[in-house]
Amino acid sequence: MHRLVALDVDGTLLDPAHNLSARTQAAIHAAQRNGVTIALATGKLLASVQPLLADLRLSGTHITCNGAALMAAATGAPVATWSLSDAQVELALAAIHTLAPEMAIAWYTTDAIYTDSPWSQLDETLAAYHEPPLRHVARLDHTLPPPLKFLMTGDHARLLCLRDALRERIGSAVTVVRTTSDFVEVMAPGVSKGVALRDLAARLAIPCEAIVAIGDGENDIALLDEAGLGIAMGNAMPALLPHAQQTTQSNAEDGVARALERLGLA
């Protein structure tokens, strides 16, 4: 019996224009009426998905910052966090500055995003993903709240090269992932949506075999691996497909709604 559904947001729950379709909204409402717990599993801040939580009538706890935080929807407070240590921050920033000195860096905390760069492509791209405005500071250092992750954006081919170079240089000390074609992100070692899902499921006393996870990106691999049933979107990155037991239609075709309907949850 499926008791918990974990849903990636961009590229999965939302359509290509970052909107929630009526069919998907109705399917999630139906699943909740059928006793299924719905948890979002996003790379974004909780504040960025609060309007979505309201539209879906979701409370409870949700996975944010690619698994670096569990956040309570009702209060906006962290339930659990896995931040980068001072040593990991120093290592990661040095590597990014060496390998991609032209790229702006976003420093994510539980409730804000900081950068030491002037207005740039980073601001524009994150705005398109409905993230809150970046807080521009003089420098990224220990005077800021501990970071849950670092994020970089840029040319897609350049990002792919950066991901591989960062993994080669510091991959034994931190987690490096390409979350969408737009982003490369750095988190503490062992941090993933899958680890956060395991923690959330334990808090809810739900066994992994009763979990369905749906996603489309490289950062959803661990999410699908942790669930009893992993479903890849029709628009999923090729790297995700070997980790899915099922596929559904793309996010332009109400893939989440169709998956929930086929499972008899909606």
Regions found by a protein language model. Give the residues of each.
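Short active-site oxyanion
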Residues: 35-39, 58-60, 148-149, 209-211, ...
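Active-site residues of response regulator receiver
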Residues: 8
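Conserved acidic, metal-coordinating active-site core of Asp-based
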Residues: 99-214, 218, 226
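Active-site phosphate-binding/coordination module
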Residues: 19-122
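Hydrophobic packing residues within well-ordered alpha-helices of enzyme cores
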Residues: 24, 49-53, 162, 166, ...
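Mg2+-dependent phosphoryl-transfer enzymes with acidic/Ser/Thr/Gly-rich catalytic loops
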Residues: 1-4, 20-21, 185-266
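Short, structured coil segments at secondary-structure junctions
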Residues: 56-58, 65-66, 74, 170-172, ...
